[in-house]
Every structure is written in C-alpha cells, then in structure tokens.
C-alpha cells in the first residue's frame, strides 16, 4: 500500500528471521564489541589485500546468518548485496560460493537499508519465502577507493571519521520473529554543499525530514 510521498506500508509484513555481523579489530574494541557475532584479530582476515578481506567478511556474515537460522543457501530465493568498491567486487567474490541468485546494489552507506527494503518488498509481494540482504565496508579498501591508500601514510585530522570494517547479513522471510518490517521509506539525493571528505557524519545523519518526511 502506497503511503504519503515516498513510503510503502506492507499489508502482509515480512520478518527479520535472523542476522549476523562480522567486524574488524577496532570495532570489536568499541562499546558494542560484545554484540558482534565475529570480531577479527586483524583486519586482513587472513587474506592478502583489503578487498579480499572485505569479501571474506561478507561470506562469513552470510554463512553465520544462515547457520543461526539453520538454513542452507538453497533456502534463499534472492540475495540483495553490495559494498563500497567498484563493480561491487567484494560482494561478487564474497557470495560466489553460495550460488544464490543475486541483485548487486550500490548505495554507499545506504546499501544496508536499500538491501533490506528490497528484500522486504520482495517477500511482501510474494516473490519468495526468504531473501538474504548483505552489505560490507572496510576501512582499508574505502580509504584506497575514495581518499588516500593507507600505504601513502596521509595524516588524518583527529576529528576525521572512520569507515567501519564490518559486514552485516539479514535473512528476511515470512516466519514470525521479534522484529517485523511493516514498511519502507525511500530517501532522495540531497546536496547540502558539504566539501570535507573526512566529515562523513554530516552526510550520513542529515536528512530532509523537516521538508519531506513528515507524514510519510
């Protein structure tokens, strides 16, 4: 059911059946460290490159979510996944062995929400019993992609924000759980004229709520 300017309310709500999280060492040392399913001892995750490490995180997150739900990959109708790298290479390489039909997404820091929204819409519309949504980012690969490779030893201001090293996977389905997804609201592109590439927080946490999202 269409609601307001940019929202959908599901007549039959899907549920978040299971989830899993995999993070790097720095994230594990933070206040939420005890809540993650897997915390790496080092940010390469046993791989040779940051990009391979990000793929490994996605694979582990998906396998953990499936394992917690006692499901095989064949139980998933579609996978919605993305990352911060060109051509979604971390996702493509990370989920290859699962052999689940995949929609590759790229929404930068909104990819997790985008994947969950599309997975929920697909379940609510009856296109499958279960969907898998997954996303990831890696500080090392993101710095290399968008700012300065770590080997360049660029000095960062103390106020600079860090891209998280982590991956989250979510199984969305029809089985009842303690988390129900009743609808989605889709955002728009808004340019606030921000120029500081180190200040990601302003980009992530601003919204046009006052103008557009009241009564969505």
Q: Model segments located where?
A:
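Single conserved hydrophobic/aromatic residue that forms the stacking wall/gate
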Residues: 205, 212-216
């Amino acid at each position: 059911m269409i609601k307001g300017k940019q929202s959908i309310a599901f007549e039959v709500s899907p549920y978040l059946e299971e989830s899993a999280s995999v993070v790097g060492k720095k994230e594990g040392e933070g206040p939420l460290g005890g809540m993650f399913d897997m915390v790496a001892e080092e940010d390469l995750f046993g791989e040779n490159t940051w990009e391979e490490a990000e793929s490994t995180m996605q694979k582990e997150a998906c396998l953990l979510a499936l394992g917690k739900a006692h499901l095989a990959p064949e139980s998933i109708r579609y996978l919605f996944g993305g990352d911060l790298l060109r051509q979604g290479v971390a996702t493509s390489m990370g989920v290859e062995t699962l052999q689940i039909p995949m929609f590759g997404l790229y929404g930068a820091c909104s990819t997790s929400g985008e994947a969950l929204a599309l997975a929920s819409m697909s379940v609510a519309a009856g296109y499958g019993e279960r969907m898998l949504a997954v996303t990831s980012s890696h500080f090392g690969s993101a710095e290399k992609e968008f700012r300065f490779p770590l080997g360049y030893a660029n000095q960062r201001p103390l106020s600079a924000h860090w891209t998280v090293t982590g991956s989250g996977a979510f199984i969305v389905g029809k089985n009842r759980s303690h988390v129900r997804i009743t609808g989605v609201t889709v955002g728009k592109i808004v340019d606030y004229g921000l120029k500081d590439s180190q200040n990601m927080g302003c980009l992530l946490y601003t919204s046009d709520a006052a103008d557009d999202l009241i009564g969505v």
